[in-house]
């Protein structure tokens, strides 16, 4: 019995010894692999091929030192991704939802509004949109200030350094056409020398300062969202100098921004049909995302829109900034264990429900504008219309704040539904008050509304000569833009053929 026990113990000892040797061998391989990968990473950063100058805006200059990041950045030119709700291709939103033409009567967005493409298209899309007009063609001047360039190019910080921030904003859009030529890229988010994340646009820094906050104390994880917040926010052009300003002084909710604008008696345009003083929301992506569960749990923009890629011993951020639905295995499924199909269904469900409210709001708001026009024509007084125009202004602000934000119905579905529902209530209230005004003026029938069921019909109704606008834009693209490109190349500002 004792001999048998000794044999068992001996056998067990050899098993333990052999297992230990295998474990030690595997640990050795792992240590060697880790050391090799660390050496590979250190080699990449220690042996940079090119010295990059401060304010270097040419994205191609970063390719030698950061080939992986550069290559994935070039994929932002790809427009093949599709989802149930748009994707990375330019879609004519006015064609899909012609009521928006009515909302923007008297404003450039009624001419042209498409869903955004990737960052590499930023300059080209700015030049092509009808919203920037055709300066220099048949004596036409600028429709927009140079402030419109601020979020389109890493040339912007370079020019701000060269001529000053105030002077940059004061310029006309076309005056910087040969200087703002490289699309959104490296220097917008990175210090060219250290490649640390940095804030290159003064408006975000100034917004923090006015709230008593120091943006330089932000953590690296916070910076992975704040570099996006330089542009993906609500803003306006303040005063005669068109100074880019974020309306965050009173807080970062929709109501806070509205209160800021109301106290400043600010409006973007007077609606040519209803005569309401309208606010045009930009794209309050950052503000709205802060109301969502992901941001509240510390998830950054880059975590989902720039997921990590491992290549050999290198882990780097994918600079193909796009919808997380395009790479769900590297975005959603790094935290969530459900299938892609289930997760995609969850996203679409949130978007569909928000869009139900949005569609109701758009129908009511369009009628409110048209019925207000009818009331004016029937002799309504300014005193009678003032509270109605306030409802319309509030309704459209809530609509625009909700729909202008990219991905809002996913980032913060409860907040977006709240905002849109609030806007719907105000549009309906405006229509009720219009009916009362009309009744006082002896009109009690249903208001006859024009046929604005298509983009073409709506644009014709508000008085746009679309054939002329397109013709002049074509002349602009054929004559003015090539001169900008030639001049930029002559100054050494542009490398790639564009």
Swiss-Prot record:
Source species: Porphyromonas gingivalis (strain ATCC BAA-308 / W83)
List of residues binding heme: 148, 151-152
Gene Ontology biological-process entries: anaerobic electron transport chain; nitrate assimilation
Name assigned to this protein: Cytochrome c-552
Any Pfam family matching the protein: Cytochrom_C552
Residues annotated for heme c 3 binding in this entry: 119, 228, 231-232
Lineage: Bacteria, Pseudomonadati, Bacteroidota, Bacteroidia, Bacteroidales
Residues reported to bind heme c 5: 294, 332, 335-336
UniProt keyword list: Calcium, Electron transport, Heme, Iron, Metal-binding, Oxidoreductase, Periplasm, Signal, Transport
Family in the record: Belongs to the cytochrome c-552 family.
